[in-house]
Every structure is written in C-alpha cells, then in structure tokens.
A protein has these predicted regions:
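Substrate-binding/active-site clefts of carbohydrate-active enzymes
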Residues: 134-312, 320-321
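Structural beta-strand segments of beta-rich domains
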Residues: 2-7
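Short beta-strand elements bearing conserved aromatic residues within extracellular beta-rich modules
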Residues: 16-18, 67
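The feature marks proteins involved in alpha-glucan
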Residues: 1, 31, 35, 46-157
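Short proline/glycine-enriched turn/loop motifs at strand-loop junctions of beta-rich domains
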Residues: 9-16, 62, 132
C-alpha cells in the first residue's frame, strides 16, 4: 500500500512511460509521467526472464488514479491501456490503479476443495441456467430496485416480484432448482450510446479489457473499485444460495485492433495476420487472436486464474473455442 508497481511486456518498444492522471475520470489531466526501465535478464523460466519487460516501482500509493502507457516504437508512438488492467475508468477508456483494500468485500472469501460446498463432485450433474445481467434485472417488471437495475447487485437482490406477485431475478433463479448460472460476458466491453445517452443493448461479445468487470454494471461509475466489490457481492450471494457461477469468456477476438492494448503494446503479435499484413478473420468479426503464440497463451491462462483467484469463479464457457 506504500508503493505502486507497473510491469509491461513490450519487447519491440524503445522507450515506455507510465502516464498517471490526477483521478480515475476520463477527462482527468496528467499528474505525472514516469520512465520505465527495460529488463535485460534472460532465462528459460518465464518468472525469471525479464527480456522485453518494462518495470517501474513508485515509492507511494497511486490508488484511485487512472493510468496509461506511452510507448515509443522505431516508427510510431502509442498511448494505451494496460493489457492486464483489472479496473478502468468509465467505458474502459483508461486503466485504473486500485489498492488491495479497495477490492475487498466483507464476507467474501475464495474457497476451494471441500470448503466450496456449492460445487459438484460430478460435472455431469450440473443444471446450468444461462443469464444476462441486464436482461435479468433491467425491466421495470423485474421488481428490482430502480437504482439496481442492470447491475451486478440487482442480480443478487432478494424479495423481487412482478406485477402478478411471482418471484423474479435472483429469487426466480433459486426457485428453478439450478445449481449453476452461466453469466454471459461480464468483462469490460465496447459500448455505444443512443440519442438519450443510454447504453445500447449488447450481449457483451465485444471484448475490450479482459480482466476488468464491465463498468456499466456498477452502482457507481465514478469509483473504479465499486464494480469489483459489486461483482464479488453478487457471486457470494449465489454461492450462499448453493449456486455456482460460470463465466462466458471471449478470448478469440477483440472489438477493435487499432485501440486494443494487444496491438498497441506488441504490434502484430497477438493477432493472426495474413502475408499482406491484414488480419485473419475466422471469427467473422474482423480479427482473431493468435493463441498459438506463447505469450497470448500465457495471457489467457493468467486471465482465467485471475478470475478464479480474485472472484471465486467456478467455471468457464469459451466462446468460439475452435478459434483456439
């Protein structure tokens, strides 16, 4: 809590700076730029190999502020989010720095083995209900409190009924008798807005920041840690009800390549490319990630482990698994 560390793998960069902003808002001015140092220790072990890894430790807490990386390459410069960012400013535009305390929720605990009593010994016994946070809670007929509609906390609210007095949302799921819910994508995604400024409908298959929960499902968009606490609270409620939580993940493509932190940190590495420099398109959405490349495989594993160890996620559904 008394220092802030940054690491970035960008082996083709010539210089890298951490750009820290005064707050976590999208329009916050720059507070300071810090020069990062390039690692030069070679090892066959990923943990010990620092070649191409840029490091910086600032001897103070920068929690609550947004940041980006300014990266110089031989022929261009990029300003980008952290590929490993766990929290963002609204709409996922900038990475956000959080302290461990800002991620904690009273009563939330990651459990494994026999302590995870809601998990099944035999996966063939799973009865899975696929759900979308917004679909479950956004309608006025959901009975969910207006301030919680479309949010993680809304999906865990109890005592909700429709106009006929029938159970809705969380209570409805509990009455179904299922033992797992499969959440359609809850990681940060690209968003568009209508003329009234409302987020347009989206199932979530436009990934933008893989390790950060979707900010529009937070009860406080101005606090980058709130969405993490809200999601943990929701997951704990389902676990307490004896229901496991499966997460739908979309590692096969990103919404954008130009603005994606993959392309802006290691150009032309994380995506499958054609000989003419264009993107391969096996996904049908304009690009596909290169899971045959070692560092993207590592990224996927790191990301999955983060969701398990931080949020106690019980399983994953892989979108377009054939791409991998």
């Amino acid at each position: 809590e008394e220092e802030t560390s940054f690491k970035l793998w960008s082996p083709t960069a010539t210089t890298v700076q951490v750009v820290v902003y005064e707050s976590a808002s999208n329009d916050a001015p720059i507070l300071k730029k810090y020069e990062m140092k390039r690692g030069n220790s070679y090892s066959y072990s990923h943990k010990d190999n620092t070649i191409g890894v840029w490091n910086l430790t600032v001897p103070e807490s920068l929690a609550g502020r947004a940041y980006q990386y300014q990266i110089d390459f031989p022929h261009h410069q990029s300003l980008t989010r952290d590929p490993y960012t766990i929290a963002t400013s609204p709409d996922g535009k900038r990475s956000a720095i959080l302290s461990e305390k800002e991620r904690q929720v009273e009563g939330f605990e990651v459990k494994n083995g026999t302590e995870a009593t809601w998990r099944l010994e035999n996966p063939c016994q799973a009865v899975i209900y696929e759900m979308h946070i917004r679909d479950l809670t956004k309608s006025e007929t959901s009975g969910v409190a207006p301030e919680l509609r479309g949010t993680f906390l809304g999906a865990a609210q109890t005592g909700t009924v429709n106009h006929f007095g029938q159970s809705t949302a969380f209570d409805y799921i509990k009455e179904l008798g299922v033992n797992y819910v499969q959440l359609q994508p809850i990681a940060d995604r690209h968003k568009e807005y209508d003329a009234d400024g409302n987020v347009t409908y989206n199932w979530g298959y436009d990934p933008q920041n893989y390790n950060a929960p979707e900010t529009s499902m937070s009860t406080n968009l101005n606090d980058p840690g709130q969405v993490i606490r809200d999601l943990k609270t929701m997951i704990q409620a389902y676990h307490d009800a004896g229901i496991g939580v499966i997460m739908d993940v979309v590692y096969n493509h990103t919404f954008s390549t130009v603005d994606a932190p993959f392309q802006t940190t290691v150009p032309d590495y994380y995506y499958r490319m054609n000989r003419d420099g264009s993107y391969q398109n096996g996904t049908g959405v304009g690009n596909e990630t290169a899971s045959e490349h070692e560092m993207f495989r590592k990224y996927m594993i790191d990301s999955l482990l983060y969701w398990v160890n931080e949020f106690n996620i019980d399983g994953f559904r892989f979108d377009l698994m054939g791409i991998h």
